[in-house]
Structure formats: C-alpha cells, structure tokens
C-alpha cells in the first residue's frame, strides 16, 4: 500500500510518500532521492523494499524550492543538477533527520530504522547516519561522499556501499579514497565492473543491467543479514 503523507517541521510540512509492506508493519527504511527527486524509479525501488517487508518513507527533499523535475522533458539531467545545486546541504540533512524521526515514530514501524539513498541521496544518507541513530546504511554511489569523509568515523551502523568502476562523476581514484575512509568490520563495499554513475536507474543513459542485478542481490542479502524483517516481528 502506498500513501502520500508529510513530515511536520517548524517552518512547514515536507511532502513524503509512504509504502507499507504486505504485513502492514516492519522495520523502517528512510529512502532518500537521487537528483531527479522521488522519481518513478525511486518509487519502484521503494515498492521493492516494501515487498521485502519494510515500511518505506521517501521525503520530497526539493520541497523548499517549490519545484520538481519534469521526467517527461529531454533535459531531465539538467533539471536535476540545477535543483540539487540550489539545495542547502545542512538544511537538507536536517530535513532528512526529521523524516527519520517521523518514520521511527510511526505505529507501523517495529525493529528500528535504516537510511538508504541513491546518488545525491546516498550522500545525504551517509551524513544522516553520521549525525543520527540508524540501524543500517545503504548508499548507492553517494555523490557527496568525497566531501564527507571527515564524518566517516561517526558512521557506526552496519553499512553497504556500491560504486561503479566507470563512474565519470566519482572517478575510481575518489572511490578508492572513500573505500579507505569508510572501511571497517561493519562495512561492505562493492565495486561493479564497467558500471557508470546511477547504474541502477533504468534510464538508458545510466543503466547497467549486470551491475543492477548484482548490486540488488547484494543489497537484499545485506538487509536480510543486518536488518532482518523477522527480527522486527519478534521485537514487536
């Protein structure tokens, strides 16, 4: 089940989208958007996570700008880059932490909350995990990570990172810097050969089918081990 909701903030209500699992309850996942907003693709991944048994909340991080990306236009990449460039990073992290708190407080959530993000959202999720209590972190090619490595020591939750070896936005040299900074016993780090940035996005300009399949299998396995739905049911 999917519904539109909002996160109440001191200066307004941030729109958000909620997906419930078939059971109606489970552990929570805060799903943070790529630069294209809560796009069709992000919604499809939210549904995938809900079908695994998670309660998923995806906030509209562009809400303060009063604009969204029009996915029907040819300049979708330029739109996304422009909107992301206008966001205040610290405010966006604060909004995301508020969404995490709201998700944790929902009656459907049992068994903790995790942060999960793609691209822009991968960096936001990493920052959220550094300043708030999360049970797990999943970051797909977090685009801001090269600028956030001073926070690495503050991210203590079990973490999963995915990057492509052919990412033109985050060159392999930077990816290796990220790997060195975040490595530890609670961290899984995967490089996907030949995959570029946003390889999980089904748009032809980004998609890498083999990397998508491999990364999703690794992600679902990681979640099953480190953030299991069954444990949430037992804790309820």
Task: Give the role of each language-model region.
Residues 1-236:
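N-terminal cap/leader regions of alpha/beta-hydrolase-fold enzymes
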């Amino acid at each position: 089940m999917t519904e539109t909701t909002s996160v109440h903030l001191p200066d307004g209500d941030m729109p958000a989208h909620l997906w419930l699992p078939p059971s109606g309850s489970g552990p929570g996942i805060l799903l943070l958007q790529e630069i294209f907003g809560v796009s069709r693709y992000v919604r499809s991944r939210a549904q995938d996570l809900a079908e695994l048994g998670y309660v998923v909340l995806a906030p509209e991080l562009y809400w303060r700008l009063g604009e969204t990306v029009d996915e029907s236009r040819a300049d979708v990449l330029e739109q996304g880059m422009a909107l992301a460039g206008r966001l205040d990073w610290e405010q966006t992290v604060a909004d995301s932490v508020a969404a995490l708190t709201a998700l944790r407080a929902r009656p459907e959530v049992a068994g903790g909350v995790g942060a999960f993000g793609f691209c822009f959202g991968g960096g936001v999720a990493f920052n959220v995990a550094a300043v708030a209590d999360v049970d797990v972190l999943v970051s797909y090619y977090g685009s801001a990570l090269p600028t956030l490595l001073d926070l690495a020591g503050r991210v203590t939750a079990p973490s999963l990172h995915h990057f492509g070896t052919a990412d033109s936005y985050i060159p392999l040299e930077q990816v290796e810097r990220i790997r060195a900074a975040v490595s530890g016993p609670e961290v899984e780090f995967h490089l996907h050969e030949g995959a570029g940035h946003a390889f999980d996005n089904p748009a032809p300009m980004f998609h890498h089918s083999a990397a998508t399949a491999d990364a999703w299998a690794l992600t679902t396995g990681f979640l099953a081990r480190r953030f299991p739905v069954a444990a949430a049911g037992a804790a309820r």
